[in-house]
Swiss-Prot record:
Keywords: Cell inner membrane, Cell membrane, Membrane, Sugar transport, Symport, Transmembrane, Transmembrane helix, Transport. Belongs to the L-rhamnose transporter (TC 2.A.7.6) family. Its main location: membrane. InterPro entries: L-rhamnose-proton_sym_RhaT. The keyword Cell membrane applies. HAMAP family: RhaT. It comes from Citrobacter koseri (strain ATCC BAA-895 / CDC 4225-83 / SGSC4696). This is L-rhamnose-proton symporter.
Length: 344
């Protein structure tokens, strides 16, 4: 396996670790509605950071974006909005199916859809079937899916042992939302694929290869921001027990602390895709669809490890932890299989 591929896998791991940890600061926010907290974090992660970093990278910010016609920018924006819809459905999936089953189904679907639909859309699916490297990467995707399933099973065992149930369990509604969430969340993968002309234009301007995807985030995350912030603002305006005024009527020190914690959560959320861009840049172009599989499977892996470190599994018993450990090992094996496939 070449150093470039190894580093690509490593950066995807770092990005996924940030994704697995980003909600920790949000959990420390006190006496604020979820909508206010999520909006502050979202403004940082979807608007401030993409625009600021792009302004630092590009020699002429406005000239870069104005060089693209609507037929290039619109699909990128709409796929970003598609991801935003999946993101909103994610929380509802947890409500109706519970954390483990909801995550397992949603992540499993988005892993498959986001990974395999890209080469199909590009007319390159034959590379998966007719080449040794393609078949090996396809095997890696399958093994990763098995790993996600094992981790999901561990979570179910943990919830059963600790008496944790879904907030409003509804299998039919939950499964429908999980499928929608999985499909729509793959919009981020499709957006990265649609943004290739933007990456190439950034490279032509002399932007370092590690950073060429970052300017496209202004458009991708702009689409996601429209959906997420729109959802939050509508709820803040219409739901009687939610109020921005009430959230900002707390003691000044608490308001500042909540803003800083929400901003930190937003920063950590953004860093997952900052390092995703680094990892994506190191993956061979013919296998760039594998970036999504690496990100999502590592997200599950890191989520399990973070849970162990934070002692969330302390009272779960030995069996759930053993099953979780097995799932993590399977995901690591999947990453190695994919790496060898890309190197062959």
């Amino acid at each position: 396996m070449s150093n470039a591929i190894t580093m690509g896998i490593f950066w995807h791991l770092i990005g996924a670790a940030s994704a697995a940890c980003f909600y920790a600061p949000f959990k420390q926010v006190k006496q604020w509605s979820w909508e206010t907290m999520w909006s502050i974090g979202g403004i940082v992660s979807w608007l401030i950071l993409p625009w600021t970093i792009s302004a630092l990278l590009l020699p002429d910010f406005w000239a870069y974006y104005s060089s693209f016609n609507l037929s290039t920018l619109l699909p990128v924006f709409l796929f970003g909005a598609m991801w935003g819809i999946g993101n909103i459905n994610y929380g509802l999936t947890m409500r109706y199916l519970g954390m483990s089953m909801g995550i397992g189904i949603a992540i499993g679907i988005t892993l498959i859809v986001g990974t395999l639909m890209t080469p199909i859309i590009n007319g390159n699916f034959d590379v998966l079937i007719n080449t040794e490297g393609g078949r090996m990467t396809l095997l890696g995707v399958l093994v990763a899916l098995i790993g996600v399933g094992i981790v999901t099973r561990a979570g179910q065992l943990k919830e059963r042992k600790m008496g944790i149930t879904a907030e409003e369990f509804n299998l039919k509604k939950g499964l429908l939302l999980a499928v929608m969430c999985g499909i729509f969340s793959a919009g981020m993968s499709f957006a990265m694929n649609a943004a290739k002309p933007m990456h190439e234009a950034a490279a032509a301007l002399g932007v370092d290869p590690l950073y060429v995807a970052l300017p496209s985030y202004v458009v991708i995350m702009g689409g996601g921001a429209l959906i997420n912030l729109g959802f939050c603002f509508v709820r803040l305006a219409k739901v009687k027990n939610l109020s921005i005024k009430a959230d900002f009527s707390l003691a000044k020190s608490m308001i500042i602390t909540n803003i800083l914690l929400s901003a930190l959560g937003g920063l950590m959320w953004y860093l997952q895709f900052f390092f995703y861009a680094w990892g994506h840049a190191r993956i061979p172009p013919q296998y760039d669809y594998i970036s999504w599989m690496l990100h999502m499977s590592f997200y599950v892996l890191c989520g399990g490890i973070v849970g162990l470190v934070l002692k969330e599994w302390k009272n779960a018993g030995r069996r759930p932890v053993s099953v979780l450990s097995l799932g993590c090992v399977v995901i690591i094996i999947a990453a190695n299989i994919v790496g060898m496939g890309m190197a062959s």
